[in-house]
A protein has these predicted regions:
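Short, small-residue-biased leader/transition segments that mark boundaries at the very start
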Residues: 4-11
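Active-site mouth of glycoside hydrolases
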Residues: 124-127, 142-150, 163, 169-173, ...
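Short glycine/proline/serine/threonine-rich loop/turn segments at secondary-structure transition edges
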Residues: 110-114, 153-157, 229, 269-284
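Beta-strand-rich binding/interaction modules
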Residues: 128-130, 213-255, 263-265, 285
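Low-complexity, Pro/Ser/Thr- and charge-rich linker/hinge segments at domain boundaries
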Residues: 185-202, 307-321
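Short acidic/polar inter-strand loop motif in beta-rich domains
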Residues: 166-172, 290-297
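Accessory beta-strand-rich segments of carbohydrate-active enzymes
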Residues: 18-19, 33-37, 65-68, 73, ...
Length: 403
């Protein structure tokens, strides 16, 4: 696991933070070739081969669910599983499998870079092949999975094949009170990164005792798959949201990077505007890495807010003031698209909440799409985030997961 980030090769692009404008990003959303099998025995064993003939296959929209596009039916359950519980086993005779195939092209400009395949969420388990070669497996429907496909792709045309299983042993931990639907339900894309890069970062923001000055603690992980022991400059910059982009902090740290390094920054920022649900003031944190000649390798940016949350004398305080939580539970659900929701749908939900004086939302009962958290940050909503763990169907006897 790592933080949500996307690298850019210019400072301007990093401030825009629109990855669709990057030449090193390619969406794989849209039409995929698709074959439905009611159980694993009925699926084609060789569908992942590069030269497999899928001309007679149907098409399916990704992201999406096969139950909402003409194959099988959705199942709604709360405190039961859609199969007799016998962990870790799942039924074999009616465990549907969706086989997906899609072609994509790697441009010449990606040569020499590391290439990654990103799945935002797949329910419930899946295998991945590139050009007929097995790349990996993942399960856990509500968190992203990434695969380094550098050694599997070629410049020019390539093929990705995916086998998605409706049930897996992970289904025992995904017993949420909601519709049970299957498939690639979040975005899919590929992207290319420099051999030397910012691999992760973790920013903690707060306020001092006066609630006027900001405190930021930052840990940056850098990775070097290129030339070792070369000096690199890591720059941290914080600007406000005004038209002039006033600088509040600017610092550079020069270090050599063997295979991986971690760098820490701690600073106090004077006279910041604090973040609350009523006034969601945000700042732009920009991280960049450059080589010894000053050439920018990549830059990333992230919106951050300064707030201090405490519990004192039974009161929940935000920036020293007691607040009243007026919250709602929210499932990721669209009446047409199911859990394959769009940004427009998210914004519409948030606007309805704000219009009705709602200031908090619970992600019942799993992590949401990354964009949801960014929008809550921008519009001003307190978020109660939940892990993708719920096992209602096993809770009333000695073999329950609670034991």
């Amino acid at each position: 696991p790592r933080s949500t980030l996307f690298p850019y090769t210019t400072l301007f692009r990093s401030l825009q933070n629109d990855r669709t404008e990057s030449k090193y990003f390619q969406s794989l959303n849209g039409d995929w070739k698709f074959h439905f099998s009611p159980n694993p025995n009925d699926r084609s064993e060789n569908f992942h081969k590069a030269n497999y003939d899928d001309s007679d296959w149907s098409e399916i929209i990704v992201p999406g669910h096969w139950e909402l596009q003409g194959w099988s039916v959705p199942i709604y359950l709360d405190e039961e599983y859609p199969f007799p519980p016998n962990p870790p086993f799942v039924p074999h005779d009616y465990n549907a499998v969706g086989s997906y195939r899609k072609s994509f092209t790697i441009p010449d400009s990606w040569d020499g870079r590391h290439i990654f395949l990103h799945f935002g969420g797949v329910r419930s388990a899946f295998y991945v092949w590139i050009n007929g070669d097995f790349v990996g497996y993942s399960q856990g429907s509500k968190t992203p999975a990434e695969f380094d496909i550098t050694d599997f792709v070629q410049i020019g045309e390539n093929n990705v094949s995916v086998a998605v299983y409706r049930f897996s042993d992970g289904s025992y931990l995904e017993g949420q009170d909601t519709w049970r639907v299957s498939g690639i339900e979040r975005e899919v894309f590929i992207y290319a990164r420099s051999k030397t890069r910012i691999s992760d970062f973790f920013a903690i923001t707060s306020l001092d005792s006066t609630f006027k000055n900001g405190i930021i603690s930052l840990k940056i992980d850098v990775e070097n798959k290129g030339e070792p022991n070369q000096p690199y400059a890591i720059r941290v910059k914080l600007t406000d949201s005004s038209r002039r982009k006033r600088e509040l902090y600017d610092s550079t740290f020069v270090t050599t990077i063997d295979s991986s390094n971690s760098i820490r920054f701690d600073s106090e920022i004077t006279r910041v505007k604090s973040w609350t649900a009523e006034e969601p003031n945000l700042y732009t944190l920009r991280l960049s890495i450059s080589d010894s000649t000053g050439r920018l390798i990549e830059a990333i940016s992230q919106k951050v807010g300064f707030k201090k949350v405490e519990v004192k004398n039974g009161n929940l305080l935000v920036n020293g003031k007691a607040i009243m939580i007026r919250g709602v539970n929210r499932h990721e659900w669209d009446p047409v698209r199911g859990r394959a929701i769009t940004e427009e749908s998210m914004v519409r939900d948030i606007q309805l909440m704000k219009q009705n004086n709602i200031n908090a939302v619970r992600t019942s009962h799993y992590p949401n799409q990354e964009r949801w958290y960014e929008l809550c940050n921008e519009y001003g909503l307190y978020v109660i985030d939940e892990a993708n763990i719920e096992a209602h169907g096993m809770q009333f006897h000695d073999e329950s997961f609670g034991h």
